[in-house]
Amino acid sequence: MNRWLKILIALIVVIAIGLIAAGLYFYNYAVVPGKKDFINENTPGSKVVQTPEGAWFKDDKNRQEWSITSEDGLRLKAIYLPADKKSNRTVIMAHGYMGSAETMSVFAKMYHDWGYNVLAPDARGHGKSQGDYIGFGWPDRKDYVQWIEKVLTENGQQEQITLYGVSMGAATVMMTSGEKLPDNVKAIVEDCGYST
């Protein structure tokens, strides 16, 4: 084998190893759940802010924990807050990147004040839900179809459902809109999807 061919093969191997290492680094940096040093502390939906709404969300006496098992076997958790007066309207919320149900407290309180039942799930790999990677809405869309089914099972077939998402959660509800949804889903609100 001539010398230049050996150098070329060695160069290709080094470049391939470098690309694989870079890919693994960036996968772990962005997709694996955990503390992210690149997230600005003011990024909407990425941290729990001490507000009156946050205290209400955490301490509401009617707060319930709901759970489902995803199609791929993950245990997913959510916080359910029934409306103060019996209501057949439920909003299902979707938080942003590295957020959790609690980071949606301001929006949860707003919908609750409007007379909605509120369901705030932790996306896979976030909060109390299981998951080894962040799906950026794609696998989560199927989870939200299951959350819709859970609301209908728990609250009845007369329920009118709104999906509301912020940032990555907005991407989630947009992707959910492409699935076969029951007629009970009356509105889908995406707040700043893909802008962050």
Language model features: what each stretch is:
Residues I134-N155:
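Alpha/beta-hydrolase active-site loop
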Residues V14-T69:
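An N-terminal hydrophobic leader/cap segment in hydrolases
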Residues E71-P82:
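A short loop-to-beta-strand scaffold at the N-terminal edge of the catalytic core in hydrolase folds
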Residues K150-E154, E159-T196:
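Primarily recognizes the serine-hydrolase "nucleophile elbow" in alpha/beta-hydrolase
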Residues M1-I17:
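N-terminal Sec-pathway targeting helices
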Residues A108-Q130:
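Conserved alpha/beta-hydrolase
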Residues Y97-M110:
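The serine-hydrolase catalytic nucleophile loop
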Residues N88-G96:
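Short beta-strand element of the alpha/beta-hydrolase
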